[in-house]
C-alpha cells in the first residue's frame, strides 16, 4: 500500500483519514469550556446515563483472587466461555463453549473475522444504512465494503433479491447482518434469516451477524429471529458482548459464537484461535467475573428497557401527525 509522506516519516495510506472537525465540534468545545449546561441526546456512554448498577456485586466479582494467576487460553478461559454458553442455553439456544471465542470488544471481533475471511481488497457486503464504525474497521483491515439495501418503505427489511444479485456479481468474502440494525432498530425476521443462510451457503459466503443490541426489543414479535446461532447451512459468526448486553463497556469483553456446518465451524475456530493467540487481549479479571456478571443481566437490562420505553413514548408524542419526522409503526 502506498505511503503518505509527512515530513521525514511515511505513514500508511490506510490511516490517511479526514481529521478536520465538523461545524458542531468547536461550538461544543466552547460551550463545555464555558461550563454551559448541555442536554446531549447523542450520549451513548451507559455509565453516564443515570443507570443504577449493582456496584458492590460487580466489584466483588472482579476481585477474585484467582485473577492474580495468569493462565492464558487463546479462545478465552473455559469458565468464561462456559458462562456464555450457559447464558445462551438459558434462552433456549444450544451452543458448545468450544464454539465460543472471547475478544476484548466487538470491534476486535470484526477485525479478527475480517482477517480470517478476507485478503486485502476483498469485498464484504454490509447493510445500508449501517453503523459508521464499519467503514473505519474495514479500512484498517484492508477490506472493501459494498452496500446492500435496507428497504425504508418496509421497516428497513433486507432486500433479499438484491443480496442474491450482489453475491453473484461481486462474490463477497462475507455478508454482514446487524440485528437489530444500527441505526434502523429493525430485527431480522426468521424468514429473512433462513433465506439469507440458504443464499450464502449456496455461494460459500460466511455470515457475520451483530446481535449486540438483541436483548432490547420493546415488543414481542413471533416472526423475529431470536439469534442466528444454530445449525443453519451457512458458516455463521454471531457477535455480542458486555458493552451492550450489560451496559458495561469499560469491562472490555465480547465474543464470537461460531455455528453452521460442523467441518467449517471447526476449521474457523482453529484459525481464530491462532489469531487470538497472537494478541491474548482479554484480561483475566473480567473472565473470572463473567459467570457472576451475566447473572446480573435481568436487573441491568430491566432499567435499560424501561428507559427505552419512556424515550420511545416521548418520541411518538413529540413527532405527532404534522411534525417534520414520523415514527414507523
List each language-model region with its residue ranges.
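N-terminal small-domain helix-loop-helix segment of the aminotransferase-like
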Residues: 6-7, 14-105, 112, 162, ...
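Helix C-cap/helix->beta junction micro-motif
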Residues: 34, 141, 170, 202-203, ...
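Conserved PLP-binding catalytic core of the aspartate aminotransferase-like
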Residues: 46-49, 308-309, 321-329
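Conserved core of the PLP fold type I
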Residues: 67-198, 214-230, 237
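Residue-level marker for buried hydrophobic side chains located in beta-strands
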Residues: 179, 207-208
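Walker B catalytic acidic pair
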Residues: 211
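Conserved core segment of the aminotransferase class I/II
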Residues: 229-309, 313-320
